[in-house]
Amino acid sequence: MLYTWNIEKIIKDTLDKHNLNINYEFNNNLTVPMSYNVSTNTIKFNYLQVNGYISKIRIKETDENFVKILLYHVIGYYLDFKKNKHDIRTLMYGDEEEIEKLKSKIETNAWDYGRTLIPEPLLKSYDKVRELDKALIKNRLTNI
C-alpha cells in the first residue's frame, strides 16, 4: 500500500524531472485516484482511491510505477490544456452530445500527451492501463 508521502514523492520527482510547474496536493474527498484542476494548476490525489484503482487494474508493475502511469495520464490533461484552449463553457452549458464529445476529446488527448513523456520502459504498461481503464469506465457505465 502506498501512502500520501510515497505518492507525493513520486509526483514531485516526476514534475522536477520534466521541469513542470504544477502544484500538487492530496485530497481525501476526491472520488477518483488523481485529477488535474486547470483553474488552480493543481494535481490532486486521494491515496485510498489510488490504492483501490491499483487493485482493480491488475498489471505486472510495481505500485510506484503504477502511480507514475496514472501521473503521466494526469500530466496529459495539463499538456492538453496548455496546447488546446478548449471552450470549457461547453462542459457547463452545452447539450449532452457536445459535452460527451468534448470530454472524449480531452480524455483521448490526455492519454496521448501523457504518452509523449512517459519513460520507454513503462510504455507498454501505460498502453495496457489505458485499454483497461477504458473497459473499466465502459463497464461502470453499463452497470448503472
Predicted regions span which residues?
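A metal-dependent hydrolase signature that marks the N-terminal structural subdomain at the beginning
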Residues: 1-40, 121
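A structural signal for well-ordered alpha-helical segments within the folded catalytic domains
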Residues: 5, 73, 108-112
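Active-site scaffold of zinc-dependent metalloenzymes
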Residues: 23-65, 81-82
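The feature represents the first ordered module of a protein
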Residues: 50, 70-72, 97
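Long, well-structured alpha-helical subdomains associated
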Residues: 62-65, 98-104, 112-144
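Catalytic Zn2+-binding segment of zinc metalloproteases
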Residues: 64-91
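Post-HEXXH active-site segment of zinc metalloproteases
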Residues: 81-112
